[in-house]
Each structure stands twice: as C-alpha cells, then as structure tokens.
Design a protein with these regions (language model features):
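Catalytic active-site module of serine/aspartate enzymes centered on a nucleophile-bearing elbow/loop
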Residues: 122-126, 130-153
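Hydrophobic/aromatic beta-strand patches that form the interior of the parallel beta-sheet core
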Residues: 6, 87-90, 115-117
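Acidic beta-to-alpha connecting loop that harbors the catalytic carboxylate
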Residues: 91-95, 121, 128
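Active-site nucleophile loop of the alpha/beta-hydrolase fold
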Residues: 6-15
C-alpha cells in the first residue's frame, strides 16, 4: 500500500518534451498516457493516449519556466492515485526548474493531492542535480521528513 510519494526533480515533462535551452515546450508524445507510455486508469476511461485531450498552458508560472501540457477541462482523474499524497520538489542549480512544475500541475489536475516546493523559496538554496550530496542535504531531508510527518498517517 502506497501512502505517499516523494519526487525530487521529477522526470518530465508529461505528455511531451521541453527544449531547456530555449525554454519552450516540444511536441506532444503520441504514446504518452501522462507521466509514462504505460496505460493509466482514468475516470472517465481512456482507450488510447489520444483520448486524453491536452493543451499547452497559455503562460508559465515564472520567467524561465516552460509552459506545461495540461488536460482539457474537465480533466480525467487518476483513479488509483486518489489516496496517495505526493511531494515534489525542484532546485535552482540544475536544468530541471524549466519544467519541474509541470508534473505536479498535471497530478493536481488529475485529482492527486500534490505539493510542489521550490527549495530556494523555503530558504534551501544553491543545490545541484544531486541534492543528497550537497552540504545542506540535512536541511533538505529535514524539510521532506517534516512534510511526510504532517501529511502521511
């Protein structure tokens, strides 16, 4: 039984790709069900990836972030994920912040309670792609542990 998931620098973006140098979204992957090419159970049911209608956001949350592929409303819900809490985090020292907000946006839209944190916004800055090797890795794990204690019974 999975109660929660912690995702640091989530792979992505969902449904497509991003040119991180140009900070632009790439074309939709016609085989993607959302996060992967593996089939998901949605409510309303989808028989193929093309049944999951998506559109690019009009505007990103911040400068330097790409727009995300999101479902056309009303969004299909991920039925098997509805009782799982997700913590997703990004850091400023890598190329990931360009698209890291996209997966949490998709999950929340699909009915999965997902908290997204940019570590620099909570005073934990200067990390690279390998957070567990940074001098402030203890601060990172304390933050994540605090989230788990607060959000997982």
């Amino acid at each position: 039984l999975v109660k929660a998931m912690v995702s640091l620098e989530p792979g992505g973006p969902q449904f497509g790709s991003v040119d991180t140098a140009k900070v632009t979204a790439g074309p939709r992957n016609p085989n993607s069900w959302g996060l992967t090419n593996a089939r998901y159970e949605y409510d309303a049911p989808a028989n193929s990836p093309s049944d999951v209608n998506v559109v690019l956001e009009q505007k990103s949350d911040r400068p330097g972030e790409a727009v995300c592929w999101l479902q056309v409303e009303p969004a299909r819900k991920l039925t098997r994920w509805k009782n799982i809490r997700v913590f997703s985090a990004s850091d400023s020292g890598t190329y990931h912040p360009v698209y890291d907000p996209c997966i949490p946006k998709f999950l929340n839209q699909a009915g999965v309670k997902t908290d997204f944190v940019r570590f620099e916004d909570v005073g934990i800055a200067g990390n690279s792609h390998v957070m567990m090797l940074e001098k402030n890795s203890d601060d990172i794990i304390k933050y994540i542990t605090g989230w788990l204690q607060k959000n997982v019974n």
